[in-house]
Amino acid sequence: MDKQDRYNRRKNIRNFSIIAHIDHGKSTLADRILENTKSVETRDMQSQLLDSMDLERERGITIKLNAVRLKYEAKDGETYTFHLIDTPGHVDFTYEVSRSLAACEGAILVVDAAQGIEAQTLANVYLALDNDLELLPVINKIDLPAAEPERVKQELEDVIGIDKEDVVLASAKSNIGIEDILEKIVEVVPPPEGDPEAPLKALIFDSEYDPYRGVISSIRVMEGVVKAGDRIKMMATGKEFEVTEVGINTPKQLSVDELTVGDVGYIIASIKNVDDSRVGDTITHAERPAEAPLQGYKKMNPMVFCGLFPIDNKDYNDLREALEKLQLNDASLEFEPESSQALGFGYRTGFLGMLHMEIIQERIEREFGIELIATAPSVIYQCILKSGEEVSVDNPANMPDRDKIETIYEPFVRATMMVPNDYVGAVMELCQRKRGQFINMEYMDDIRVNIIYEIPLSEVVFDFFDQLKSNTKGYASFDYEFIDNKESDLVKMDILLNGEKVDALSFIVHKEFAYERGKTLVDKLKTLIPRQQFEVPVQAAVGQKIVARTNIKSMGKNVLSKCYGGDITRKRKLLEKQKAGKAKMKAVGNVEIPQDAFLAVLKMDED
């Protein structure tokens, strides 16, 4: 392709992604766009086509982003190349959204005609505006009985400042308004900028591992041209590789001669280690490198940590391999080895939030066949010791003794909740109970209120979202962002079984709630841990002080069942023998702890 062809091609490229709150019909709209541009054979079409994981289809959510190239014959007679980059909608996967947006010039903002704007819609709009993207507003599901497109149009104008006239009304399910959306993409989304003659600059926005071909990186070319045979260099790591193949997704992978300015495709360069092709890195030519890497990609740090332990110890190395493979596609997943007296060897693993944690656990069990025990999640606490030293603690078992600590800081988040008027009281009460600090409240319209609180992250990660949903009959929507670490009066609570600490059950709690949480947990453990042949005391302790205690009664075993009549001394001898055996068993302290017991720490608020 010569210089002029590249310039001509560039003006007909449109790169866009679809952003929406979870369940507003984003994946269905992506399906309709694929269908209407005849990108997929009718026989290959299935719902949620771009959601390639079984888990995504089952839960009906998008977890991984996906990029696909489409051809569209517009009414002006020109043929346009669309690159659609599908994004997740759940708050935990904001980093996936920020990656997609960095590779686009425009975004279709999908809003449900019945639900209206929700908390995550706003969060994604702000992300899009940060990336200077053109917004194309679409009100979806207009054929629902409860749809109120005019009210939602007004909302878009009042809350986001979008002109009502620019809004497209559609129903992805019934294929209404899809043609208007395609025409609007041509009109609203600007063609990519960039010089095909300049040194190569390409953004890696996703990567996956293929056992035969190595790492396959999804890229968006910002400047220059890349083709097979080129020697490339990663700007963050300085590593060099030779390109073996470049191609596009249609949604199937298809190799092409070259990728030039504005193209979204994939690149394979015999990269064996995922760390060498990091998401957010810039690719350039080794011989003629670009001066500076691309800006605009945010590294997401894990917010929630938990221990993952294989039920069978011999799976330890397989678990490491599984985590490494998942980390390939998931730049925000972090892990390091840890050992626990109760659970043996495993990994302390960091996630973006609770849904992220659940999904990673489920993928390890499904895709790699490793059965896991997971400990209750915790967040990172900063401790300033009396010696002046500063320590970060992501595992409650490693918290220094209270008498050595000067101050403890815990992470706080700004939580934005959109709630119907009738439930404002219940939501505010929930936030106060979770140690929240009221910041602001504004009425969006006659029906809904936007409430903002600052809440400790440790209170949010447990079951805040579930409780918010149940307190509002499922109508609330929720989004949060990390703001800062703040000083808190926290203590570490240990759980003792049979007089021995179980490190995997330790947790950190606010001093004010220590007694009631300790009491709730020991009562819960009493019901979850099976009865042993001897009585087992369950205690909750803060430092040396026991704050709550209960006993798991022993299982009665009738050793006299085979004694029919006979001498009383014979019976006494059998009972003495049983007593000695129980004492020995108790000394060893082998209490079987089921997985539910470790998760009980999570569910303490539900009773």
From Swiss-Prot:
One of its GO terms (cellular component) is plasma membrane. Keywords: Cell membrane, GTP-binding, Hydrolase, Membrane, Nucleotide-binding, Protein biosynthesis. The lineage of its organism: Bacteria, Bacillati, Bacillota, Bacilli, Bacillales. It is a peripheral membrane protein. Belongs to the TRAFAC class translation factor GTPase superfamily. Classic translation factor GTPase family. LepA subfamily. Its main location: membrane. This is Elongation factor 4. Gene3D superfamilies: 3.30.70.240, Elongation factor 4, C-terminal domain (3.30.70.2570), Elongation Factor G (Translational Gtpase), domain 3 (3.30.70.870), P-loop containing nucleotide triphosphate hydrolases (3.40.50.300), Translation factors (2.40.30.10). One of its GO terms (molecular function) is translation elongation factor activity. PROSITE patterns: G_TR_1, G_TR_2. It catalyses: GTP + H2O = GDP + phosphate + H(+). GTP binds at residues 23-28, 140-143. Signal peptide: none annotated. The keyword Cell membrane applies. It comes from the Bacteria.
